[in-house]
Curated annotation (Swiss-Prot):
It comes from Dictyostelium discoideum. The keyword Transmembrane helix does not apply. Keywords: Lipid biosynthesis, Lipid metabolism, Methyltransferase, S-adenosyl-L-methionine, Steroid biosynthesis, Steroid metabolism, Sterol biosynthesis, Sterol metabolism, Transferase. GO terms for molecular function: sterol 24-C-methyltransferase activity. This is Probable cycloartenol-C-24-methyltransferase 1. GO terms for biological process: hyperosmotic response; methylation; response to bacterium; sterol biosynthetic process. It comes from the Eukaryota. PROSITE patterns: SAM_MT_ERG6_SMT. One of its GO terms (cellular component) is phagocytic vesicle. PANTHER family: HYPOTHETICAL LOC100005854, ZGC:194242. Belongs to the class I-like SAM-binding methyltransferase superfamily. Erg6/SMT family. It catalyses: zymosterol + S-adenosyl-L-methionine = fecosterol + S-adenosyl-L-homocysteine + H(+). Pathway: Steroid biosynthesis; sterol biosynthesis.
Length: 354
């Protein structure tokens, strides 16, 4: 069996998992439509009151989002739920791995180090970074479904000795002060209700002199809050990705400083990419890449609809797929207008006590 055949086999197994409701999917049930509608209620407005409501309910909001989206993400994107810069002639999979290894390189990871991945998803980046660096990586996640899925993937990859999980809210990590040598997050802390509060918690658990790196989702400085078209793109990105409120680069930097970190570097990595970061959402030539295209997403939707009709999928799976397709459309629009980026890179240091 060649690589493409193995990839296709894995993809087909995951589209069945979209709806088979694996036994460890704690918060899942057959009322997918009700869950999706309840999630959408949190995004009825975009004024300060509505944004605050999303922040107040962020744990429920984010868990609901990932209960709905995880299997679709893994089927159409892979085990690493993030974007990446991309060079000409570089495959999508290679760009994703390089993006993760760049983080490990910037943090200076090596065997024996103890590192925490803030908001680790099903652990794709964690496994890449553990393989690349030899460091012990602990994945922090508050979604039980993703953790159970990630544990199986760790075991399958032969990395259970280097990769593990903690189930907890990243605003309240149940570990002692100065526990980890380094910390990182890849497109995860955009879900935080209070960025300063989150960064303070990361500051607390990292050892003095330790580094914290992250890829943040931002509205770039080109975003015009007075332009209704751009405001709608922002709102739709937030709705489609379980976010309380997207901010500009200065707020990211100021939050890190307010938490006590020394900011080493901060820049939008997307500006260094030879190919647009959103290219996988609009084109692709591999089997996996095809699933990212408009045609691929359409066919995925039709197959999901068929599963509903023959009762292999609960009602609402098709609507969930349509909702995620819509989210992809607005991510592309934000990228094309250069008003949104999912990879504002921030590297900070916790001051040494010396």
């Amino acid at each position: 069996m060649n690589t493409q055949q193995r990839a296709m086999e894995g993809d087909l197994s995951r589209i069945v998992a979209i709806s088979r409701k694996e036994k460890d999917a704690v918060s899942r049930n057959d009322k997918v439509d009700d869950t999706l509608n309840g999630y959408k209620e949190l995004f009825k407005g975009n004024d300060d009151k509505a944004i605050q409501a999303r922040k107040n309910n962020y744990t429920h909001m984010v868990n609901t989002f990932y209960d709905l989206a995880t299997d679709f993400y893994e089927f159409g994107w892979g085990q690493s739920f993030h974007f990446a810069t991309r060079h000409k002639y570089e495959s999508f999979e290679a760009s994703i791995a390089r993006h993760e290894m760049y983080m490990a390189h910037q943090l200076g990871l090596f065997p024996g180090m103890k590192v925490i991945d803030i908001g680790c998803g099903v652990g794709g980046p964690m496994r890449t970074i553990a393989r690349f660096s030899g460091a012990n990586v602990v994945g922090l996640n508050n979604n039980e479904y993703q953790i159970q899925r990630g544990k199986r993937l760790n075991e399958s990859a032969g990395l259970s000795h280097l990769c593990s999980f903690i189930k907890a809210d990243f605003m309240h990590v149940p570990v002692e002060d100065n526990t980890y040598d380094c910390a990182y997050q890849i497109e995860a802390t955009c879900h935080a209700p209070d960025l300063v509060g989150l960064y303070k918690e990361v500051f607390r658990i990292v050892k003095p002199g330790g580094l914290f790196g992250g890829y943040e989702w931002i509205m770039t400085n080109k975003f015009n809050p007075e332009d209704p078209v751009e405001v709608n793109i922002k709102k739709q990105i937030e709705l489609g990705n379980g976010l309380p409120d997207l901010v500009k680069p200065a707020e990211i930097i100021n939050a890190a400083k307010a938490a006590g970190f020394e900011v080493i570097t901060a820049f939008d990595v997307a500006e260094t990419s030879e190919l647009p970061w959103y290219l996988p959402l609009s084109s692709g030539v591999s089997i996996t890449g095809f699933l990212h295209t408009g045609v691929g997403r359409y066919l995925t939707g039709k197959f999901t609809q068929l599963l509903e009709i023959v009762k292999l999928a609960p009602a609402g799976s098709y609507n969930t797929n349509v909702w995620l397709q819509n989210a992809a459309t607005f991510l592309v629009q934000g990228g094309e207008k250069q008003i949104f980026s999912p990879m504002f890179f921030l590297l900070c240091r916790k001051p040494s006590t010396d």
